[in-house]
């Protein structure tokens, strides 16, 4: 028997999606190097590879993230929408990059409850 390795869903928290204008320099350096070719940047810019087979996606980000611009999440959601892949996105007004569970910012911490509801809505558990 063969098992599919395609994920049933993706959960993206302040994701790095773009290797061009809205890149996170540290991620780009670690993934493709300082002197990456244009083709490498294209390959690692995930919004350019969304297809109707992309799994449903839950995204959250903060608009004040100074490390990874919120445009990364917006670009990915736009790409999902264009091929009619189901997604839910939450953009919170405050919060730095790397908040984890965000317990120190109650308004942002609600992402966990939203995720749980999304998982149930999509019959993932």
Where are these regions (language model features)?
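Loop/turn elements at helix/coil->beta-strand transitions in domains of secreted/extracellular proteins
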Residues: 6-9, 54-56, 83-88
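Primarily recognizes the serine-hydrolase "nucleophile elbow" in alpha/beta-hydrolase
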Residues: 1-26, 41-42, 118
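Active-site nucleophile elbow and catalytic-triad environment of alpha/beta-hydrolase enzymes
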Residues: 34-49, 54-55
